[in-house]
Amino acid sequence: MAGTSHADAYIGLGMTDDGSGTAGLAGLNALLAPPTRPGCASPVNTGQAHYVLDTAEFALHRWATTGIRPARAPRLQVDTSGSAPVFVLDAHGNVEGGVRTPAVDAPVATLSGLGQSGASFCFLFGTTTPFTAERLAALYPDHATFVTKWTASTARGVASGFLRPADAAELVKAARQSGVGG
């Protein structure tokens, strides 16, 4: 999954997810102002892995009970031309390829599963580097532009089999309620 880490901010946000849809907006806001963890040097990853993992669990159950295979994703892009392999990054610093979510296709931050330092388990949390207000304004001159790009990415996720429709609705609602753009 592009832009995710082994553990992320949803570990804390998920405790407040009561199914009402407010967790989507909390997750989007966390992209803009990522939380930290005690002992970790940088704000933790706020990628949207939990939505894709929810879909994967559904797809696994469906495969086991009906034989319908889950969706297959392209691999994360890796450059092996140097002395050590490195991820291929887009203009925003997010990895290319893999399962895509709105957080990497309509980005408001650079998301990585790498680069976290600090105490004990910090390396599992990856990092989030929010874009500056100037960069956000250049990417999304108005709120409608952001919502359109976020919604299109969400629709691609559903069509590709990597987002569930209910999660997609929560993501789109969060984009509409956000203050991103303009």
Residue ranges and their predicted role:
Residues 1-182:
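C-terminal His-loop and adjacent cap/lid subdomain of alpha/beta-hydrolase
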